[in-house]
From Swiss-Prot:
UniProt organism field: Maricaulis maris (strain MCS10) (Caulobacter maris)
GO cellular component, as recorded: cytosol
Protein name: Glycine--tRNA ligase alpha subunit
Organism classification: Bacteria, Pseudomonadati, Pseudomonadota, Alphaproteobacteria, Maricaulales
Gene Ontology BP terms: glycyl-tRNA aminoacylation
SUPFAM superfamilies from the UniProt entry: Class II aaRS and biotin synthetases
Compartments it resides in: Cytoplasm
NCBIfam families the UniProt entry points to: glyQ, PRK09348.1
Pfam families: tRNA-synt_2e (PF02091)
Family: Belongs to the class-II aminoacyl-tRNA synthetase family.
Length: 296
């Protein structure tokens, strides 16, 4: 870092939002359904499909119940934040745009070693994959960028460029701290731990010890049935159906965190969620094509 004071966690977010807004992105809000990664926000998963261009950026809280450590691990969380950017079609200067965002948050590339390490991305739960790279700053992974090839089992019509910033990890790097809970949250004396440590403790206890497995399994079946019902309408409703696909995915993650799914069963659960995602993607693409044709 330069001599300039490192940005707080919230200032880091504001700078990224301002930067990507200046590049023509719609700055969206977090999706209000639990997701395991920012990519699963419909502004990325669904909007990456179909023929219409799209440029958006947003913060997304992500929940991975099995990653909780009762607030005792300095860099592993069951609830954390990602900053997502989706550019469709992908611009030819995506890498330069990304490097410009590092400048915006105060990383002096003349003083730090920024490298792109090939690492293709795949999310089998939603039938998605793409060609990608991890971005490393001084040996620490801080971002991932991906050229989507397939989402929900559908080949993309326009290749999208997706950027994912791990906000906590990036902030730890920028601020030079070793423990996520020591992060300067707002530049006014509040730390990340002041905001989130108690939640990490309580949700870890819930995820591993108290989540009612039988109830969660019934909820999973209900979400699965509702998703399929919405997709089987004469005029399918892919957006609300996708909400229930996301709910099913999160419920699976909770049951998995409780240790209630065997290795053999796990593949079956993932396949069920993937089928929901594929159904949502198929219905979305059909609706997008119809809208594009109507606009011609």
């Amino acid at each position: 870092m330069t001599a300039e004071k490192a940005p707080s966690f919230q200032e880091l977010i504001l700078r990224l939002q301002s930067y990507w807004a200046s590049k023509g992105c719609a700055i969206l809000q977090p999706y209000d359904v639990e997701v395991g990664a920012g990519t699963l926000h419909p502004a990325t998963t669904l909007r990456s499909l179909g023929p219409r261009p799209w440029k958006a950026a947003y913060v997304q809280p992500s929940r991975r119940p099995g990653d909780g450590r009762y607030g005792e691990n300095p860099n592993r969380l069951q609830h954390y934040y990602q900053f997502q950017v989706l550019l469709k079609p992908c611009p030819t200067d995506l890498q330069d745009l990304y490097l410009g965002s590092l400048d915006a948050i105060g990383i002096d590339r003349d003083l730090h070693d920024v490298r792109f390490v090939e690492d293709d991305w795949e999310n089998p739960t939603v039938g998605a994959w793409g060609l990608g790279w991890e971005v490393w700053c001084d040996g620490m992974e801080v971002s991932q960028f991906t050229y989507f090839q397939q989402v929900g089992g559908q080949d993309v019509e326009l290749v999208s460029g997706e950027l994912t910033y791990g906000l906590e990890r990036l902030a730890m790097y920028v601020q030079g701290v070793e423990n996520v809970y020591d992060l300067d949250f707002n530049g006014a004396g509040m730390t990340y731990g002041d905001v989130f440590l108690e939640a990490e403790k309580q949700y870890s206890e819930f995820n591993f010890e108290h989540a009612d497995v039988d109830m969660l399994i019934e909820w999973f079946k209900g979400a699965e049935n509702q998703c399929m019902a919405l997709l089987n309408l004469d005029k399918p409703l892919p957006l609300p159906a996708y909400d229930f696909c996301l709910k099913a995915s999160h419920l699976f993650n909770l049951v998995d965190a409780r240790g209630a799914i065997s290795v053999a069963e796990r593949a079956s659960w993932i396949a069920r969620v993937r089928e929901l995602a594929k159904g949502c993607a198929d219905a979305w693409v059909k609706s997008e094509r119809a809208l594009a044709e109507a606009a011609e």
